[in-house]
Amino acid sequence: MMMNKIKNIYKVGIVVFLIMCFASCVKDTTNTTYLGPDLVEFANPNYIAPINPTAKTVATTTTPKNDSMYIQLVGPQRSTGTSVTFVVDAASTAVAGTDYSLSTPSPVEIAPNTSGIKIRVVLNKVTAQKKLIINLTGGDKVTPSANFKTFTFTLNP
């Protein structure tokens, strides 16, 4: 009698196991591939605190600070380079040559078979808070993302 109960429990266990195996093999029909137009956008890959991908606050010192912002391609990688242009916004209060200098001039080129490029900037000591605002203006068959086309450095003394 006890042996029959053990056999029945064993059989039920095997059936449950087989059902779980077949149920877990259901094909995922969710498509997560981006199908929209090719865009470029600023991305600030800050893995410690990824709060704001398009802004950064920097405390300046007497020694110039090297920093960067990242432009990424949204869409498939291309077999040829992708030219991207950017400009310093007229609303910037930081002065070129005094408060900052762009080590990477516009336009930049996203290399073939890659998804982005860094724009390097040198930030100098400021005596009052200043803002450096960079806008993406487009490029080689790409348009700037509406939400991530502006990057702002806030320079603090």
List each language-model region with its residue ranges.
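Residue-level detector of intrinsically disordered terminal segments
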Residues: 1-2, 19
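Bacterial N-terminal signal peptides that target proteins for export
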Residues: 2-14
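Enrichment for repetitive, rod-forming helical segments
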Residues: 12-14, 18, 34, 156
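C-terminal motif of bacterial Sec signal peptides marking the signal peptidase cleavage site
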Residues: 20-24
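Short boundary segments that mark the start of a structured unit
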Residues: 26-157
